[in-house]
Amino acid sequence: YSIGNKNIFKRDGKKYIISPYALMLEDQNYYLLGYDTNDKKFKHYRVDKIIGIEATTEPLDGQEEFKEINLPKYSKKFFSMFGGNVEKIKLQVDSDLIGVITDRFGKNIIIKKINDNNFEVIVEIAVSPQFYGWVTSFSGKIKIISPENTVTDFKNHLKKVAEFYK
């Protein structure tokens, strides 16, 4: 949307060709999980922002790829359904947040106790600014340990935010 509350379309208003597979609820919004035929990958589309839908008789693209997706596990990788490179991230977490971690990533994760105050967990996450915002929302109680490129990106993200407030 523009400041005048008018629609501004991505891709110069060109139509998307999407094979729809699932609806997911995240942060009180429904998202369509669809296979983008042009980009040859799954993407998320907020349902209330979709306009001008047309059905085709073309077969669904991405059927083999969709068979590999476990929807509950898949959705836990994304923060506010924003995409990003999916990576295995090691986090050091304050023990008080065990419930937060299991709520977010499920109970089938491996948790390693470090000491009475902290534990480590490795989770698959789509790294994005929204993920970084989630980490910072716990005021230093969650630390990204690895991979090193994600730690560096997070530090750069924090520097940009700090610079904005100088």
Per-range role (PLM):
Residues L71-K166:
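Polybasic (Lys/Arg-rich)
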